[in-house]
């Protein structure tokens, strides 16, 4: 008898002691030890309840002492499974006992209000009864789930005030480790993706919103960065008012939180708006928020963000280190998340289908180390510099921009900051940055490596404290962003056809023509009555003189034709190259011109074997004298020089020689690479089988040197391949001839429509009279254009681009 009384008194004193400890601000070790003592106490009572229960209740009925009745009441509460929350989540404090699978945790506010008014005359069975709060049900994991959410309106003052006091921060929950440095926290209703409402502990700490299933959990179910998000307050008029906050983060789905009152909603709205930096309108409308917005489309991305949340929240300006339990991340994949992926396959397009320019982002939020403190800043790459801004609006610079040219980008992961990297210039640290995930870190590494001009390979970096999967993700994202950025700068363009950082070398769109010809024809070229008749040089598609017969002799014989008045429509249609067409600028667009037959004095005697091309152009009498002088002055100048044909031939020759040289050098490098790899393989085998530790160090140094040589030659081979592709492209352009205006013509058509070349013997060269052409009717330029063959539409270089892309990817 005395034994049981002593045990009962011990239990009562121990319970009171635990209540006192709940009111104190304990360290983590003390909280852990207190939870262990409480767990042992519960297990002891549970194991002995079967034999002592009847006797204890008999004592409760017969004993009239007030103190012992209160002690027995405390023991009955310990024995009552639902009353466990009184010890752990009571009004006096919070107890961090591990959750029992067989004893689901009830929401704390529902138990507090009902367990306090207990009289000593109640029947023993009353201690085992507990009404379910509201109409909530409990699932397997002990989480309160309700199919509908109804807040208490302001007219129900008592319940509203009590609920706000129990849920609104600050509360007794603030003594928990999770609540330290929190801006605001409360038990709120969160809408799940199937429309269900679950009451969870929501905490806003630093710049993140974290939702916990219970106050004992260290791993949040939801961890979202609030920077840049939009938030709106919605009030729905139903049977009772519903106060909801709709939060739309930048990289995850919509989050809907249910509040107890309008004041609580406005308080949360203000806190989230201050963090996000976007003052969204507190719109109150009656629209129903669908459950589609809450479907978890990216469980994997959420896992990575949740993992990186430890580093980001740990890198706050407060400098408080996070506990290992918070940094630890558990991968949980539920059937609901898998089902959401299947339901949303057709809703969201893959990012690979988007254009590279759209998918390639050069600005985003990063953590920046400023004065030994991590701060979130909006970083943007522009004109070879990395700019830092306070927010996305770019209204205020947070720091001086960093020039990236010539810098070294080196990852430096630490135990607290896995995705941090540094920007160095000549060994001096310019900036230290931290990404939010492995994919984001790889993306920024690729961008910074390309902008800095560094030839470092992301695979060669050392990633401490990062596992193999995340390293693979970082390397893959870095290469992807690097090649996308390189493609953005190096993709061929009509107007900008040069890689980034190189001087733009454009093909001359117009051939070089001496100004002396034009200046000689300008004076006295027209009369007052003939002012309306103007002459234009009809630039029609021509092939390079490489494809013609008698090129050299033709180049030596012909001079430079100037803009002259043309007569001869039929001859113009027969020989479209080498003739001039007249166009009269009137409203009808037709060309009307009088037929004029003018004989021109024969040109100077040409060199032996020089052919004369026909038909020649007959000029008006007024231009005859000036034409004679011009022909004499420019007879020694080849037409190819004036029209840029010699330049084309020289370019073809130069590019051909350069291509052959590069191909030969490529083969030599391949042979060298094969030899180096063979030597490296043999050296690795030697190092593996070497028993002598003294020789092992020398062999390892030689092996490291051999690997560096392999990497250097491989990098040189990649540059050589890219240069060879560029030379081949330039050679192809040169073989097509100079750029022309208008339409393009098939080569076969040029062969058939080439003008006949009339050769004169050396002795009879002076007697060769020029051919004069006559015109039967005016020339309609529109009809002449229609009679020409249809242009060849050159579209698509898919195979060529694919091969180039494969070469870049293989390197």
Curated annotation (Swiss-Prot):
Gene3D superfamilies for this protein: Pleckstrin-homology domain (PH domain)/Phosphotyrosine-binding domain (PTB)
Coiled-coil regions listed in the entry: 642-737
SUPFAM superfamilies found in the cross-reference section: PH domain-like
Location(s) in or outside the cell: Cytoplasm
Entry's Gene Ontology molecular function annotations: protein tyrosine kinase activator activity; SH2 domain binding; SH3 domain binding
Keyword presence, Coiled coil: yes
All residue ranges annotated as the PH domain in the record: 181-277, 359-453
Stored Pfam families: PH
Region: Disordered, residue numbers: 67-110, 132-168, 294-326, 500-532, 558-631
SMART domains for the chain: PH (SM00233)
InterPro entries: AFAP, PH-like_dom_sf, PH_domain
Keywords linked to the UniProt accession: Coiled coil, Cytoplasm, Repeat
Cellular component GO terms held in the UniProt record: cytosol
Stretches with biased composition (Basic and acidic residues): 299-309, 521-532, 566-577, 622-631
GO BP, sorted A to Z: inflammatory response; positive regulation of DNA-templated transcription; positive regulation of epidermal growth factor receptor signaling pathway; positive regulation of interleukin-8 production; regulation of interleukin-6 production; regulation of mitotic cell cycle
Quaternary structure and partners: Interacts with src.
Entries under PANTHER family matching the protein: ACTIN FILAMENT-ASSOCIATED PROTEIN 1 FAMILY MEMBER, ACTIN FILAMENT-ASSOCIATED PROTEIN 1-LIKE 2
Role description: May play a role in a signaling cascade by enhancing the kinase activity of src. Contributes to src-regulated transcription activation.
Protein name: Actin filament-associated protein 1-like 2
Organism: Xenopus laevis (African clawed frog)
Name of the gene: afap1l2
């Amino acid at each position: 008898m005395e034994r049981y009384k002593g045990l009962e008194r011990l239990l009562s004193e121990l319970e009171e002691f635990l209540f006192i400890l709940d009111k104190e601000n304990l360290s983590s070790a003390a909280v852990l030890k207190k939870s262990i003592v409480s767990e042992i106490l519960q297990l002891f009572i549970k194991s002995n309840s079967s034999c002592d229960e009847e006797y204890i209740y008999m004592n409760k009925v017969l004993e009239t002492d007030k103190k012992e009745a209160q002690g027995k009441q405390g023991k009955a509460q310990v024995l009552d499974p639902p009353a466990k929350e009184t010890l752990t989540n009571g009004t006096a404090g919070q107890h961090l006992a591990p959750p029992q699978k067989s004893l689901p945790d009830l929401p704390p506010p529902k138990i507090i209000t009902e367990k306090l008014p207990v009289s000593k005359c109640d029947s023993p069975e009353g201690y085992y009864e507990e009404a379910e709060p509201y109409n909530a049900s409990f699932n397997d994991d002990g989480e309160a789930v309700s199919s509908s959410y109804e807040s208490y309106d302001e007219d129900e003052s008592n319940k509203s005030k009590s609920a706000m006091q129990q849920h609104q921060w600050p509360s007794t929950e603030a003594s928990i480790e999770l609540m330290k440095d929190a801006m605001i926290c409360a038990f709120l209703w969160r809408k799940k993706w199937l429309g269900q409402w679950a009451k969870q502990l929501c905490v806003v700490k630093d710049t993140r919103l974290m939702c916990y299933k219970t106050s004992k959990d260290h791993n949040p179910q939801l961890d979202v960065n609030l920077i840049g998000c939009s938030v709106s307050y919605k009030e729905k008029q139903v049977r009772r008012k519903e106060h909801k906050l709709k939060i739309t983060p930048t990289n995850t789905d919509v989050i809907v939180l249910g509040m107890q009152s309008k004041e609580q909603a406005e308080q949360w709205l203000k806190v989230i708006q201050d963090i996000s930096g976007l003052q969204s309108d507190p719109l109150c409308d009656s629209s129903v928020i669908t459950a589609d917005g809450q479907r978890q489309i990216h469980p994997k991305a959420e896992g990575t963000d949740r993992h990186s949340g430890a580093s980001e929240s740990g890198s706050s300006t407060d400098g408080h280190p996070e506990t290992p339990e918070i940094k630890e991340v558990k991968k949980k994949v539920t059937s609901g998340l898998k089902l959401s992926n299947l339901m949303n396959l057709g809703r969201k397009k893959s990012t690979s289908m988007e254009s590279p320019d759209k998918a390639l982002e050069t600005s985003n939020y990063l953590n920046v180390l400023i004065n030994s403190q991590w701060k979130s800043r909006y970083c943007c790459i522009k004109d070879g510099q990395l700019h830092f801004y306070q927010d996305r609006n770019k209204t205020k610079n947070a720091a001086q921009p960093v020039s990236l040219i010539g810098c070294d980008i080196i990852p430096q992961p630490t135990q607290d900051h896995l995705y941090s990297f540094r920007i160095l210039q000549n060994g001096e640290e310019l900036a230290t940055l931290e990404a939010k995930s492995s994919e984001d870190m790889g993306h920024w590494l690729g961008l910074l490596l390309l902008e800095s001009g560094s030839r470092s390979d992301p695979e060669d970096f050392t990633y401490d404290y990062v596992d193999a999967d995340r390293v693979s993700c970082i390397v893959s994202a870095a290469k992807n962003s690097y090649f996308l950025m390189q493609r953005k700068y190096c993709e061929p363009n009509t107007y900008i056809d040069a890689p980034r950082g190189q001087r733009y070398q454009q093909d001359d769109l117009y051939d070089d023509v001496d100004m002396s010809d034009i200046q000689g024809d300008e004076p006295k070229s027209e009369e007052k009555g003939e002012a309306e008749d103007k002459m234009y040089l009809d630039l029609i598609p021509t092939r390079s003189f490489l494809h013609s017969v008698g090129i050299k002799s033709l180049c030596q014989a012909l001079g430079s034709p100037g803009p002259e008045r043309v007569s001869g429509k039929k001859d113009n249609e027969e020989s479209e190259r080498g003739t001039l067409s007249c166009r009269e600028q009137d409203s009808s667009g037709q060309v009307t011109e009088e037929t004029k037959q003018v004989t021109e004095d024969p040109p100077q005697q040409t060199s032996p074997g020089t052919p004369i091309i026909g038909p020649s152009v007959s000029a008006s009498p007024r231009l005859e004298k000036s034409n004679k002088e011009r022909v004499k002055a420019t007879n020694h100048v080849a037409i190819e020089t004036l029209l840029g044909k010699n330049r084309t031939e020289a370019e073809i020759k130069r590019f051909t020689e350069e291509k052959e040289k590069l191909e030969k050098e490529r083969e030599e490098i391949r042979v060298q690479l094969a030899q180096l790899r063979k030597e490296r393989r043999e050296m690795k085998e030697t190092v593996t089988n070497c028993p002598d530790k003294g020789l092992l160090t020398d062999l390892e140094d030689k092996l490291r040197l051999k690997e560096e040589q392999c990497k250097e030659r491989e990098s040189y081979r990649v540059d050589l391949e890219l240069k060879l592709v560029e030379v081949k492209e330039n050679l192809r352009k040169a073989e097509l001839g100079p750029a022309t205006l208008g339409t393009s013509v098939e080569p076969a058509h040029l062969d058939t429509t080439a003008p006949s070349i009339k050769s004169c013997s050396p002795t009879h060269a002076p007697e060769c009279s020029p051919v004069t052409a006559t015109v039967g009717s005016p020339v309609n330029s529109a009809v002449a254009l229609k009679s020409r063959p249809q242009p060849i539409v050159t579209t698509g270089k898919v195979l060529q681009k694919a091969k180039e892309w494969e070469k870049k990817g293989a390197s």
